[in-house]
UniProtKB/Swiss-Prot annotation:
Domain of life: Bacteria
Protein name: tRNA uridine 5-carboxymethylaminomethyl modification enzyme MnmG
Gene Ontology CC terms, in alphabetical order: cytosol
Binding sites annotated in the UniProt record for FAD: G8, A9, G10, H11, A12, G13
Known cofactor(s): FAD
Subcellular location field: Cytoplasm
Chief place of localization: cytoplasm
């Protein structure tokens, strides 16, 4: 018998099995194709707005995704650099093939993991708890816990024009049949979602004189806190072009053969990542849409056409592509397509990702209604950790909304009504000023170490960094600069420099003051800093904390206020039917979602402030 069985080796499954194995659990990873581990079936990229923050949080908790993209990335950029630090988001283009090879190698080299190439079509359940996984042959593999990371494979159906056929993730991969029906027989409620992917083109057929080059950052920052530098990495360029009105007219000619508009697609698609035909239908007044041409690897001619996701007929796809500047003679390697698949409404999971209906069964990734590699990987990591902790009879590991984007993600899943593929945005995180990509290790490394996924070396490295930040902050608070030095530091600034000596910490709160300039201006300050550290990441943390100090203090007060509600647990057996004073909608939503705390209950749509007041009185202040 295995401790933990993981079904599916996509981004959720990989992080789940690695997290569990690294905590000492005996694990089995079951996947239908061992050559497709961590396959990037859609865009060949990791990170982006909010997703980059999640990737660095995964790294801080001992996950693998950040290391994988550092090793296999072909272009690195920091998005939103012109905005405040809370909005900075790392993103990298990946070598799609190498990413999969890297992740398989890591899994094969990890102790405590066995691999089986097969498919899970059912669960062995006894007395309300999972006991193992059932394969198509009828064989039952016993396990103390099972984590389902099914991606888009559950009854997957691919659409290209009016043609549709079974498919699991790509056109060449079969779907998983039987598992949805097995879960429904156990009491789970399933829904249907849709996602899509654009065509791939031959990069040799692009006219580069008509497209705009988009290069990587000259001094790229690694995703992983354990990668020293990416300076040696040769980067490739992406390219930008636009659709035009002719493109839109050609696409409209295919609407009569569109599975999206004909009603053949029943699943709900992602609102914030619409297909190109949906964009021109919903925004008819917009004359053009940006198209990004992204290489799929350093050693392939295949190119991903970002912004052109479509399920229109192949002939329309090619005609429309060839109307775009730079693509007049383009060759299409693979058509775009839409895929429908089953998911399970996530009000049926706890914030540990264990299901409420079947004990020791965990859901992670698109089975919970999310989209995106990063969101899936984060769930896999948390499911793997919590499955391991439960087997060890240890306290569950739950991140709240003030601690991590991962906490926001999972809290949204268990409290909100998911009716379309969920993706993370910075706007989803009310504590985003504190949840930056640059401080993920400071926020989460200790928790990962306590959970067993972060080794002692990584933990001590982070603790040393935290100590250096405290010492440097103390130095900035105690050391002062004289007016003549301040005048030099503020040369050209709109504000008048102070006439009295001022603490460096107060000076650094001013937006025009640069830390590096102060090192040049004051030998004493430079000497004091060098005694503490030469790590630019430490400098960055001190400066950000000083410049955002007022905002961070307000955020802390809000966190403390919310924590008071989170401290009120709601028993799992609590019946809302007998509570007088609840609104009908509130009673219905609370019964459906079964929140674990009053704080969680307060975030369920349809539960009013007066409903929360009633609960506080009933459960006890």
């Amino acid at each position: 018998m295995y401790d933990i069985i993981v079904a599916g080796a996509g981004h959720a499954g990989c992080e789940a099995v690695l997290a569990a194995a690294r905590t000492g659990m005996s694990c089995l990873l079951i996947t239908s194709d061992l050559s497709a581990i961590a396959r990037m079936s859609c865009n060949p990229a990791i990170g982006g707005v909010a997703k980059g923050q999640i990737t660095r949080e995964i790294d801080a908790l001992g996950g693998e995704m950040a290391k994988a993209i550092d090793e296999t990335g072909i272009q690195f950029r920091m998005l939103n650099k012109s905005k405040g630090a809370a909005m900075h988001s790392p993103r990298a283009q990946a070598d799609r093939a190498l990413y999969s090879v890297y992740m398989r190698k890591i899994i094969e080299e990890q102790d405590n993991i066995d691999l089986v190439q097969d498919t899970v079509t059912g669960l062995d359940v006894e007395s309300g708890a999972v006991r193992g996984a059932i394969l198509p042959s009828g064989r039952i593999i016993k396990g103390k816990s099972v984590i389902l990371c099914c991606g888009t494979f559950l009854n997957g159906l691919i659409h290209i024009g009016m043609n549709h056929f079974p498919g699991g993730r790509t056109i060449a991969e079969p779907p998983v049949s039987g598992l949805t029906e097995n879960l429904q027989s156990l009491g789970f409620r399933a829904g249907r979602l849709k996602t899509g992917t654009p065509p791939r083109i031959d990069s040799r057929s692009v006219n580069y004189s008509l497209v705009e080059e988009q290069s990587g950052d000259p001094d790229p920052r690694p995703f992983s806190f354990h990668t020293d530098s990416l300076g040696h990495r040769a980067q490739v360029s992406c390219f930008v072009t636009k659709t035009k009105e002719t493109t839109h007219e050609l696409l409209r000619t295919g609407f009569s053969r569109s599975p999206l508009f004909s009603g053949k697609v029943q699943g709900v698609g992602p609102r914030y990542c619409p297909s190109v035909e949906d964009k021109i239908f919903r925004f008819p007044d917009k004359n053009s849409h940006h198209i990004f041409l992204e290489p799929e690897g350093a050693e392939t001619n295949e190119m991903y056409v970002n912004g052109f996701s479509t399920s229109l007929p192949e002939d329309i796809q090619l005609l429309a592509l060839r109307s775009i500047p730079g693509l007049e003679h383009v060759k299409m390697i693979r058509p775009g397509y839409a895929i429908e698949y089953d998911f399970f409404f996530p009000y049926q999971i706890k914030n540990t990702l264990e299901t409420k209906i079947i004990e020791n069964l965990y859901f992670a990734g698109q089975i919970n209604g999310t989209s995106g590699y990063e969101e899936a990987a984060a769930q896999g990591l948390m499911a793997g950790i919590n499955a391991s902790l439960k087997i060890q009879n240890r306290k569950p590991f739950v991140l709240d909304r003030s601690q991590a984007y991962i906490g926001v993600l999972i809290d949204d899943l268990v409290t909100k009504d998911i009716i379309e593929p969920y993706r993370m945005f910075t706007s989803s995180a009310e504590h985003r000023i504190s949840l930056r990509h640059d401080n993920a290790d400071i926020r989460l490394c200790r928790m990962g170490h306590e959970a067993g996924t972060v080794d002692f070396s990584s933990f001590t490295k982070t603790e040393y960094k935290i100590s250096a930040i405290r010492q440097l902050r103390q130095l900035c608070d105690t050391m002062k600069l004289h007016p003549d030095q301040i005048i030099s530091a503020m040369a050209g600034a709109a504000q008048q420099p102070p006439l009295q000596p001022i603490a460096i910490s107060n000076l650094l709160k001013r937006p025009e003051i640069d830390f590096e300039n102060l090192l040049v201006l004051s030998e004493d300050f430079r000497a004091g800093v060098n005694e503490i550290t030469t790590d630019p990441d430490v400098f960055e943390q001190v400066v950000i904390d000083l410049k955002y100090e007022g905002y961070l203090k307000r955020d802390l007060l809000m966190t403390e206020k919310i924590a008071r509600l989170e401290s009120h647990s709601i028993p799992g057996s609590f019946s809302y039917a007998t509570v007088s004073g609840l609104s009908n909608e509130g009673r219905e939503k609370l019964t459906l979602h079964k929140p674990e705390t009053i704080g969680q209950a307060s975030r369920i749509p349809g539960v009013s402030p007066s409903d929360i007041s009633v609960l506080l009185i009933k459960i006890g202040r």
